Design a protein with these regions (language model features):
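An acidic, glycine-rich, mixed-charge low-complexity segment common to nucleic-acid enzymes
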Residues: 1-136, 141, 205
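Conserved binding-pocket/active-site segment within a compact domain
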Residues: 105-201
């Protein structure tokens, strides 16, 4: 039976392509992840971590850019193509089978992000400025039945040093076993609470 977006809140196993659609993933992402601010008070020099999801980031997190070419398949336009059923598992496989197979597990494990942000292990990353290494200050990771998912986070802007956005999602059968930062408090806040709008007068370079 095909899964609906609400089913993805509590899934316990990696869904099959016959159970899940990218349209459902987009609906789930928009309904349960976007529009909220996930607040974590940490026992760390970065005392507050405020995570926000944006519609235009979903395609990148799923790895669509490794399967399809063209700016219309990423960002907010790409999100619309997922939500309206234009870009599907079938169409991705037809367009680029190798890229599709490389990204398939990432796409199928993505629904675990909801459970991950509600019970994360938070770790710091060494920000590498060279090559194609993702520049991310923090990661959320957790394991599901010996398979691990990781969400890497990057600061939104210098003007809002406590606000972070997801920059990369991955799944793996291995975990690096890094020491976790203690989470003292976590809660869900309105999307823009505490955010300082960037203007020409207050922008930092």
């Amino acid at each position: 039976m095909p899964l609906v977006s609400q089913d993805l809140l509590t899934i316990m196993h990696r869904p099959d392509v016959n159970e899940l659609s990218l349209q459902t993933v987009a609906e789930f992402y928009e309904t349960y992840l976007c529009g909220h601010q996930y607040y974590y008070e940490l026992r760390h020099k970065q005392r507050e971590l405020r995570l926000r999801f944006k519609k235009g980031d979903l395609c990148h997190l799923l790895g669509i850019q490794h399967v399809l070419n063209g700016s219309d398949n990423v960002g907010e336009t790409g999100f619309v193509k997922l939500k309206n059923g234009e870009n599907t598992f079938v169409s991705l496989e037809k367009a680029n089978k190798g890229g599709y197979l490389n990204m398939l597990y990432r796409m199928l494990y993505f629904p675990f992000v909801y459970q991950l942000i509600h019970a994360p292990h938070v770790v710091t990353n060494t920000v590498n400025q060279t090559g194609n290494v993702v520049k991310a200050q923090f990661s959320f990771h957790n394991g599901k039945r010996e398979h691990y998912v990781e969400l890497k986070l990057r600061r939104e802007s210098a003007n809002n040093p406590d606000f972070f956005v997801p920059v990369s999602f991955s799944e793996s059968g291995k975990n690096a076993h890094r020491a976790s930062i203690v989470i003292q408090t976590k809660k869900i806040l309105p999307y823009d609470e505490g955010y300082v709008a960037i203007t020409k007068a207050n922008v930092k370079y």
